[in-house]
């Protein structure tokens, strides 16, 4: 299996999804399960400029990229772009600028914020020349839960909560 990594802007990903060049629902994928709150946290991360995990796609024989890992993230991005979900400006840690965007949909954002969202880059890893068992094994490895210990959870917080 070959893995090629590239950075794609959200506007390119949205265009490819809408054109059918990226398939969010290949046969092996589960349905969309993220809550609105989880989708809003992802959008918040993007608006803050924080990096999110890469998207993994399988390039199939029909020249379509089937999403192996990242379906929920891409669906959340699409839903925000399509004005289905809005920004939650109360997500912690507080950000005085993002809090002013509370309740806004993509269409309500200033041109500058829309541009920042559209031009945010996400790493996309395209898998080619896969043996039949390889994508499923990679998916399993990428999605193995690794629970944090109580100490690790405490250390992840800053400020009063951590003391």
Question: What are the residue ranges of the model-derived segments?
Answer:
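Basic- and aromatic-enriched surface patches that contact anionic nucleotides/nucleic acids
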Residues: 1-12, 26-36, 40-163
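A short, surface-exposed helix-loop junction/capping segment
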Residues: 19-26
């Amino acid at each position: 299996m070959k893995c090629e990594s590239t950075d794609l802007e959200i506007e390119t990903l949205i265009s490819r999804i809408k054109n059918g060049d990226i398939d969010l629902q290949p046969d092996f994928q589960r349905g969309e399960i993220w809550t609105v709150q989880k989708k809003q946290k992802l959008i918040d991360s993007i608006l803050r400029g924080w990096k999110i995990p890469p998207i993994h796609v399988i390039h199939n024989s029909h020249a379509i990229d089937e999403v192996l890992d990242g379906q929920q993230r891409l669906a959340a991005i699409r839903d925000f772009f399509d004005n289905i979900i809005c920004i939650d400006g109360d997500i912690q840690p507080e950000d005085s600028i993002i809090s002013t965007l509370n309740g806004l949909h993509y269409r309500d954002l200033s041109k500058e914020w829309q541009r920042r969202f559209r031009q945010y880059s996400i790493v996309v890893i395209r898998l080619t020349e896969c043996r039949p068992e390889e994508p499923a094994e990679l998916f399993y490895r990428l999605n193995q839960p690794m629970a944090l210990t109580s100490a690790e959870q405490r250390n992840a917080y800053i400020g009063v909560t951590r003391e």
